[in-house]
């Protein structure tokens, strides 16, 4: 069972102090979290890609390279690379370079994105985004598999026997597909035999089970062995010493993160009752004491069969002292218990869906 942390690099004012980071200080803060996660022994650090002033990071590979230079073992991944708006050749080159810098620790989570800014910026029609994604994913898979690439598609110029250096240190860059709630995306990941990451940001854990079932059924039906059909999960995350302390502290930041920032804008206002419900035993929100966190991740493993959990740890203007304490508790109290429990009890329920 792998455990890690995620930053989407949102830039929001701390609701308690009004403090707002500039992009540079926010990026340096994120680098410090990656270093802290490595020092604490976590497995994965993930970083999002966005293209608006509300977020600090538009190029995850650059920031991950900064983290790579100061770390030794933690795996470094995008979450997600917005493949529909990127050139797969450049994406592969960037992460192959990161793989060389990090001595074999780079990964890509490719997805379609729930944010529209990148589509306008890179002149991609959102109406075509699934077809564009499939086309570019096909090229990215070819780039992973071959040193000399011959490929043709609809949304990028063809390649005819071209070398695309550099090659990564790993035989192939690990590639996961990021999926929100779309059954067709889960089916695609399974048919391709790629590991899948589910983004669970609301509702009940059990509501995600059909996506896990679609994914594994598609993969097994396509002839892929069960062991390659790995499933990861991301969710909003905050752990503190006590259950009530975690909820009382986190709610203002969670509300700030999700509320619409402009009239009619993206997001929603989370009431205290809604927060309590989604933070409950089967709710998607991962906040509470270390023991509650352990219990919920084990429940997710039982219901969904997850191999990897990544918590989004720095949202809504959370100050570094709270984020660092959350990382510390994840690494020192949650992770050892989960590793012991999952080593002693192999998955059954989720894998047999």
Q: What are these regions, as identified by a protein language model?
A:
Residues 3-5, 45-47, 76-78, 106-110, ...:
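Hydrophobic faces of well-ordered beta-strands that scaffold small-molecule active sites
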Residues 25-36, 94, 181-187, 292-299:
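Short, acidic/polar
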Residues 64-73, 95, 99-105, 188-191, ...:
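Acidic (Asp/Glu)-rich catalytic clusters
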